[in-house]
Amino acid sequence: MNDERVFGITTGTAATAAALASLLCLKGCEASKVRVRTPSGILEVDVEYVERISGDTARACVIKRPYPDPDVTVNLEIISTVQITGTPEIMIRGGEGVGIVTKPGLQVPPGEAAINPVPRRMIEENLREHLRDDEGAVVTVSVPGGERIASRTMNPRLGIIGGISILGTTGIARPMSTEAYRESLACQIDIATARGFRELVFVPGNIGERFAREYFESIEDERIIQMANFPGYMLEEADGRGVERIILMGHAGKLIKLSAGIFQTRSSDADARREIMAAHAALMGASRDTVTRIFNDGTVEEMISELEGEGLTGRVFNSIADAIRERFNERFSFDTDVLIFSLDGRILNSNFKTKRNHRFTEVF
């Protein structure tokens, strides 16, 4: 089960292992490895250090070891301090470097430490095996450097402040897995719908978000949803959560892929930008030479320049926006509007309804 060359451990497993090592120390066993019960089975986890602080308190550290994944939490120290109490309750708290939830809609309510339900259960179940019926514990999880690392995660966007989240659903971190990242993206929708928002602005990333903020006279932060390279997944999640209208905004380079039904937009998986642009240019009457140049251009911005030379920019991007709406109507039940931008912030299509002073609908 345990192969550090292939899998890593989640921050939840690291926190659980550190808590278990702390408790075992208080029970008279100082362990350099612990066996942690996880949803995926038993994992053996190395303990960096464990120390007794007082008669009823100990702390231990587990390092989140590297594995084949660009995980920003790799090499962080996950420290759990355990104090045995005389009541059967196990309380779990966040310390230094563990974020605090500030917005409704996540798995943890506002005001609580960002330690998700599965890690909380793992800590409780693993400790309970070694506590008497009349004993409980206070567990404080801390992550030195967690606040600094958190700026490189989705936490600031999700309203989790002051540190990282203690996460995990299986106990193991799978290399190059997109599942956890997609789930963190979908949390944006949970936060928006928890506020009663049923009309959202979907953007590919930071450039699209900048366009949205500059375009609308007034818009709440939570209403702008970043899709990254997973528009299909994110749009399905929105549809399943009762979102009624989506305004799609972003740079042409990302959005035109949706017009061809490409709902996973990472270039290494699917590109087709030149084929899409050449096809719509030809449909709108571009000359053969222009279509050929578009097909051979290296960037979408160059393709836009070719269209401007023939005065076809608006017609071509109206055609692309229509194709996007058609694709969305085939798959989703919400209403859609589309605004396609160039890198310098110009709107390339004109067949949209959403104005700058748009009043968003809400359901409470």
Swiss-Prot record:
Q: Which GO terms describe its molecular function?
A: cobalt-precorrin-5B C1-methyltransferase activity
Metabolic or biological pathway? Cofactor biosynthesis; adenosylcobalamin biosynthesis; cob(II)yrinate a,c-diamide from sirohydrochlorin (anaerobic route): step 6/10
EC assignment: the record states: 2.1.1.195
Give the first-level EC class, as a single word. Answer: transferase
- Keyword DNA repair in the entry? The reply is no
Name the reaction it catalyses: Co-precorrin-5B + S-adenosyl-L-methionine = Co-precorrin-6A + S-adenosyl-L-homocysteine
Protein name, UniProt field: Cobalt-precorrin-5B C(1)-methyltransferase
Q: Which gene encodes it?
A: cbiD
